[in-house]
Amino acid sequence: MRLKANKTWSQQQLAIKLRLHQDPAPGLFSLERQHLFILAAKTALAATLCWWLARAFGFHEAYWGSISAIIVLQSNVGSTITASRDRILGTLIGAAFGFSFSLFGALPWNYIGALLAAVILCGLLGLRNSSRLAGVTITIIMLVQKAGSRWGLALDRVGEVMLGIVVALAVSTFVFPDRARVRLRDGLVQEFLILGALFEAILEGFPASPSGDLSSVRQDALAMLRENNQLLESARSEPSGGPGWNEGLNTLLQFGRSLFDALVALEFSLEGSHQDGYAQQLEPALGKLAADIRSGFHHLAGSIHEWRFDAEPPPMNLEEDIEQLEKQMEQVRHTGIGFSQAEILRAYAVQLHLKQIARLLRASRVETSRAVGEGQN
């Protein structure tokens, strides 16, 4: 299965990373900088619009709304929603504690008490990111000397923050929206293609010398796993994109981690195998399974890109490959007397890891198909 010609930004970045082609727009108008320019324009639009609306609504300090819009506007809709939630909760908690503690006691003791109470409450509620914002709100309400009541100052602060958040959410959602779940889907395409590249780099060292790119490809795969895990949190904050979107994305992330662990185990099992000869006795079954695993990574990446997982890849059958490899091992078992015990054990370990990777690949497609509800009425 081939990926569509109109690749997304992240897929084009992967092609550049794997040296499949050069950046089509180098310099000032590269793909990465285009994304940066759009985010900068959206931030400027949100801040300016919020300042204008705040003045129109009669807020005395319109700049606080602009500050809120700048803080919560993130690179994708899901992250913006998460940041908005944290800021709303932090502002409400800070306003409540700032006003309440200003009614009794004297500075600085009531201020210290308000900060302690707000931070502890946020910690107990699991609102770690909101605790800092609550502290900022308390500081403004209790320490900024202004005419008027503390209650009025608290209400103004909440109103300005709410306005900034509403404007930021509107701009993020309707002006060149960048959905976290779509970016995560593209990130998963990258992840499984990089895992396939890692698999190929590992097998280059069996029974030859290890690939020179192995370490860098492994680091790329690990970085992609971490980035996609962060995107999942943002994707969960977005409105659902359809039946099974979040379930499917979460399933693929879990299998991606399992496949990475299996590939690392395969790499360890191949240490010292550059002169092994026993594994040659397992050909062509071993080579056929390895080739189909390579194709399996690319097929799964294509399925993620199309978001369809119910089509069995016609030219390969991983379970049949495993069965043929087991038969081949049974046939050559008597030839092991001419090889070292370490060499034989290494060959057995390799075939076990290959079988595990093959079954994980198949299970990732089948389980994701079930998670997204394919074939259900």
Model-flagged regions — what are they?
Residues 1-225:
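A transmembrane helix-and-boundary motif of multi-pass membrane transporters/channels
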